[in-house]
Amino acid sequence: MAQDPVFITRAIEAAPFPPAPNVVISYPHREDWWNRYPAVRKSYSGNRSYDEFEWPYQDSKRIYQDRVLKRLRHLQHSATGRAVLAELRARPSYSVCIFPWDFLPSIDRDDPGDLGVTETLRIPQTRRERARGIKPRGTKYLERGVSYASQYKPGAVDVFYSDYRCKESEADGVLLHELVHAMRMISGVFRYSLMGGGYGNNEEFYANMIEMIYQSERRLHVFDYVGHPIDQASVLRLPKARELITDLCRRQMSLCNALAQVKADFNPIRSVAEKLFRIDL
């Protein structure tokens, strides 16, 4: 039986994001790029110089890196984005590699409506886990738990994202959503539990909630995982919402504290944190 293609097979081109150097804007090797776009390769075939072959690849790489860098800078200039980037930066042994959506292994293209996908790391994180060969907490809850593009670099979480798939008003938030997944993976707290309200599971609830805090901070509309309008009260009425936010705050206190202080009309974390820690935010 034919295998679904994996599009990244060689060493990648990497551009670290300076405020969080382990967040890496990543681009495939030129040979993988040409192989991914055979029609483009065919149009450049024939008696052409190396420079003529190199130009379209370098131009495409530059455009992608510039666009992702713009999104990351937007996040860095927001309190919500800085909170998530700080959690990622605090674990420098683990990388988050952001790749173009087109290079997502086709085995993962289950839902054409997906705007971004995050794959988990596979290696032990703590000294105890390394000594005993224990997989990271949360890995066993993932259906496939494989880091396709970063098999050459253990400890990397891969995010597949291209902003052309998103509305302009939502493009930053979609990237932040995927970075929340990556942050929880490398923090060792990623795990699935059922969640109602259209979210499916707790991890999508967390990622959507933090994405919407960011949207609200920017005074943009907020919506649930399936696109329905929401407000803070409606989210806190959901079964398990307060329980999950409390768990987030207890397991990731620095993240919770930073997010609770974000000045936004929609911020369910603030409401829970005020009661949990008995503080006035």
Predicted regions and their residues:
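Active-site scaffold of zinc-dependent metalloenzymes
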Residues: 102-172, 182-186
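Short amphipathic alpha-helical segments that mediate assembly, nucleic-acid/protein binding
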Residues: 65-68, 80-85, 114, 172, ...
